[in-house]
Amino acid sequence: MLNEVLKGIEGLDNDMIVKAKNRVDSLAKPLGSLGKLEDIAIRLSGITGNMFNNIDKKCVIIMSSDNGVEEEGVASAPQCVTLLQTKNFIKGTTGVATLAKANGTDLMVFDVGINSDEVVEGVINRKISKGTKNIYKEPAMTYEEAKKSLEIGIEAVKIAKEKGYKILGVGEMGIGNTTTSAAVLKALIGCETSQVVGKGGGINNDSFEKKKRIVEEVVKKHNINFDDSIDIISKVGGYDIGAMTGVFLGAAFYRIPVVIDGFISVVTALLANRLNPLVKEFCFTSHKSQEIGYELAIKELGLDPMLDLNMRLGEGSGCPIAFSVIDFATAMMNNMATFEEGNIDNSYLEDVKDEECYIVL
């Protein structure tokens, strides 16, 4: 499955992009005046191949898994919180769940590695094992387990497509996963540890220093093939990270627009884009996470955050907010009149076609 997906991803429909841009530029407004909404609508057309789109059926896919490195004291919350919050996703009481309900977004929650035998009703069970190994002592998982996690993410998108979802978000739950994400990002781009290690869900200074030391050491000790994203996941990642990477790959393969949440989500988008550089064409951002590594990862991906709301929750919480903005972009494209449709003579625009006619540079 994985090789088929990696080889089968095709780029945007450039002919439709040209047509969509011409339509947007002909709408009864100053050129470019709806800013990012215009860019979103045009790229959405390039993804779907349709001029007019709607995202009336929306879903955030959440991957839940435990991380062995938690035993090193890199997180303030106990490991049991992974299971408890996964249950709360289903109850609709978490941050992402309440935001999702506010604009008609569904959640699809997967157990890919929670450290528990409990089967949670409403959660799709794809458990690879009960948590990963402790990356401070040994690789997180085998290479085959890493591939399996990717394929679970791809399968999740297939399920979402069959259910008729038109846009996806990517979220997670897993105590210790800002540590694994920081290690993955460091391995991906070769940056300083201090640039990628933040305080996650909250830790004291002693734990923060320990977290930085662990990330520094694990990237050196496991003989990582830095040119192989799957090997990076297997050595210092997590099942949640692998499955989320698979969601981004699957979204590109099945041509479904997909929204990046915060730090962990953007790291997995970057992993997917390293596996196939066309992936980012299908990705929309949401918010600028306050977790320190986010800015480096989004810059490496070549995208800009849509919003800055001082958020740092994770879970996929930024995705429903971005869905609303994307809804506005589709409303513009679908319902706004062109100059011709509005019986407006736009000949006056001939002298003000350049950006400098609208913005003081």
Curated annotation (Swiss-Prot):
UniProt KW keywords: Cobalamin biosynthesis, Glycosyltransferase, Transferase
Annotated GO MF terms: nicotinate-nucleotide-dimethylbenzimidazole phosphoribosyltransferase activity
EC number: 2.4.2.21
Pfam families found in the cross-reference section: DBI_PRT
Keyword Glycosyltransferase tagged: yes
InterPro entries xref list: Nict_dMeBzImd_PRibTrfase, Nict_dMeBzImd_PRibTrfase_bact, Nict_dMeBzImd_PRibTrfase_N, Nict_dMeBzImd_PRibTrfase_sf
Biological process according to GO: cobalamin biosynthetic process
CDD domains: DMB-PRT_CobT
Top EC class of this enzyme: transferase
SUPFAM superfamilies: Nicotinate mononucleotide:5,6-dimethylbenzimidazole phosphoribosyltransferase (CobT) (SSF52733)
Domain of life: Bacteria
Pathway(s) this gene product operates in, as recorded in its UniProt entry: Nucleoside biosynthesis; alpha-ribazole biosynthesis; alpha-ribazole from 5,6-dimethylbenzimidazole: step 1/2
Role: Catalyzes the synthesis of alpha-ribazole-5'-phosphate from nicotinate mononucleotide (NAMN) and 5,6-dimethylbenzimidazole (DMB).
The family this protein is said to belong to: Belongs to the CobT family.
Protein's UniProt name: Nicotinate-nucleotide--dimethylbenzimidazole phosphoribosyltransferase
